[in-house]
């Protein structure tokens, strides 16, 4: 073993872990220190699918088992790509990797030992290249989600928007610089690098830390670091492959029926003019089509199930609302001493939310929010002061507290299910048909949606242009225009308008609204590609599936609207109740400032 470990201190023996998806996952001995670290063990308590168990009770998996599965598939994918390429390609790739690592300004002792030598061929890494890269790729697969906050993607926006209050101005500046330089805006990727850099050296006693860091962090294009990173996060990646199979098994659906062996064993390493790529060979087209279809169906029926969407939305609003109320000025018009005492109580239970700097410690201590359980404990501890504020003499405090208590009922314990204006494509069209004048006015005011820029081929763009003239697509375009950009700012503004102007729905009484866009899950031509020899082609050039899936995405509802009653709603929402909510939504939104262009 090359590195800092002594010859009489070899790495631990490999360990085999039982897994419901892959049967057995092999953990290389060199990764045992990393697996046992506090940062990776924290993932045992970070849910994979947030509150999707609202509708799928057994969908209770955590990021830890997904990290092990991704590690397992990453090694298999790398080994396949290395095995299937020609000797001269292997030689050029290994030479470039070792040369670049040797030229790095700083290297940890283990990496430095691997690349030491007068010439590239003299380095200990040269004959062990495939194994060393396999270990590095395995480590990246294991660590790829280590930066997720409690409840994963659902609370990423909360942490990013309040990073100064939660982590300080320096962290905010560093995160902004990372996003600008890398082109990656995902908060958890920045957080993962922060956690990686604070992991103790003991975790990397038998691993080339600097090499792992290069692969984990680089998103620069087609060089070898991005090429290796793409095994975990790329056009076809083992991250997506593992979570589709794992989530499907837990949810009890058939949507994980994917020939993963065919896919992984079809990975190929190619040299391109600007660098290197790892992608799927054409022999995997049928398996790739199945993967894309199952992915689209998984999002449609599981991730974007209206009950799961509203539970996640309620968790986000509840967390944001409690934190913002606790941080608000102590004096509010109409408040009294009891209100100030309740606000003080609310502030006193807010934990240290900086999970990034506590992730590497097992002994983070009381009052630190590192995972899902900590966050739920905080929300539950907030109920007592919120209940006191719900009787406040201040209309503002009383209204905010009442909404937060109802949101907590939705997202924790599932004591309340808001009423959706529509639950599926059929009901979406029904609501449009029931409100033809309003829908026609909304569509008329909105520009015709543009053909998605990610469709490269002329056939795809022409077909998409025809789809965009259909009613569901036109209505989606109108609502997309009203609800604004990817930050969901427009959705929040419309939500506030609806709650202020339409606080009552027949049959449900008084309440408030939640509006939640659901992302456009496209099959992008530049990412869905296959290799035929040395030629890379868009999948849409050899398969009709990308266009068919784009059609589904263009036509399906792009948002959900919910009414949250303050009273007790019917146990089961019938069609008439949902119709009443849908009618109220369309009539109110037609008069909103976003629709009319008038100032609020």
Functional labels for PLM-detected ranges:
Residues 1-139, 148-600:
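Histidine-centered, transition-metal-coordinating active-site segments
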């Amino acid at each position: 073993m090359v590195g800092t470990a002594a010859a009489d201190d070899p790495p631990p023996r490999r360990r085999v872990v039982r897994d419901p998806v892959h049967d057995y996952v092999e953990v290389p001995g060199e990764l045992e220190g990393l697996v046992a670290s506090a940062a990776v063990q924290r993932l045992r308590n970070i849910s994979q699918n947030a509150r999707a168990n609202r509708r799928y009770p057994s969908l209770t998996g955590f990021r830890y088992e997904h990290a092990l599965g991704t590690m397992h598939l990453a090694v298999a994918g790398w080994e396949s790509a290395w095995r299937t390429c020609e000797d001269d390609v292997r030689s050029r790739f290994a030479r470039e990797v070792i040369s670049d690592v040797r030229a790095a300004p700083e290297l940890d002792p283990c990496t430095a030992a691997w690349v030491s030598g007068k010439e590239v061929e003299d380095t200990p890494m040269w004959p062990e290249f495939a194994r060393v890269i396999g270990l590095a790729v395995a480590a990246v697969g294991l660590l790829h989600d280590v930066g997720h906050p409690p409840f994963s993607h659902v609370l990423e926006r909360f942490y990013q928007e309040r990073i100064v209050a939660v982590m300080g101005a320096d962290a905010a500046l560093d995160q902004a610089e990372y996003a600008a330089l890398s082109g990656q805006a995902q908060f958890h990727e920045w957080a993962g690098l922060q956690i990686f850099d604070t992991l103790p050296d003991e975790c990397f006693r038998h691993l080339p830390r600097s090499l792992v860091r290069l692969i984990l962090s680089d998103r620069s294009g087609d060089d070898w670091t991005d090429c290796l990173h793409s095994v975990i996060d790329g056009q076809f990646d083992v991250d997506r492959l593992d979570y589709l199979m794992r989530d499907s098994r837990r949810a009890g659906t058939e949507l994980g029926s994917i020939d993963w062996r065919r896919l992984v064993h079809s990975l190929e390493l190619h040299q391109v003019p600007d660098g290197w790529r790892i992608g799927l060979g054409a022999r995997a087209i049928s398996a790739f089509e199945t993967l894309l279809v199952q992915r689209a169906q998984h999002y449609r029926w599981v991730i974007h199930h209206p009950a799961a969407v509203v539970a996640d939305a309620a968790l986000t609003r509840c967390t944001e609302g409690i934190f913002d109320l606790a941080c608000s000025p102590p004096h509010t018009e109409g408040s009294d001493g009891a209100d100030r005492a309740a606000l003080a109580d609310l502030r006193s239970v807010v934990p240290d939310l900086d999970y990034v700097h506590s992730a590497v410690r097992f002994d983070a201590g009381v009052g630190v929010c590192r995972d899902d359980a900590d966050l739920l404990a905080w929300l539950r501890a907030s109920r007592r002061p919120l209940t006191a504020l719900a009787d406040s003499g201040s209309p503002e405090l009383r209204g905010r507290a009442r909404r937060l208590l109802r949101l907590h009922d939705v997202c924790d314990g599932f004591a309340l299910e808001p009423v959706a204006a529509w639950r599926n494509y059929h009901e979406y069209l029904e609501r449009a048909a029931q409100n033809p004048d309003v829908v026609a006015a909304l569509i008329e005011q909105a520009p015709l949606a543009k053909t998605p820029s990610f469709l490269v081929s002329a056939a795809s763009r022409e077909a998409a242009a025809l789809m965009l003239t259909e009613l569901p697509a036109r209505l989606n375009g109108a609502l997309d225009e009203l609800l604004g950009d990817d930050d969901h700012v427009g959705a929040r503004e419309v939500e506030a308008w609806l709650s202020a102007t339409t606080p009552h729905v027949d049959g449900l009484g008084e309440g408030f609204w939640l509006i939640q866009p659901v992302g456009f899950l496209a099959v992008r031509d530049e990412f869905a590609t296959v290799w035929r020899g040395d030629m890379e082609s868009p999948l849409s050039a050899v398969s009709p599936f990308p266009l068919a899936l784009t059609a589904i995405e263009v036509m399906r509802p792009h948002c959900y609207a919910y009414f949250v009653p303050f009273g007790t709603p019917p146990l089961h929402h019938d069609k008439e109740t949902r119709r009443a909510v849908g009618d109220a939504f369309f009539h109110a939104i037609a008069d909103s400032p976003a629709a009319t262009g008038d100032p609020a």
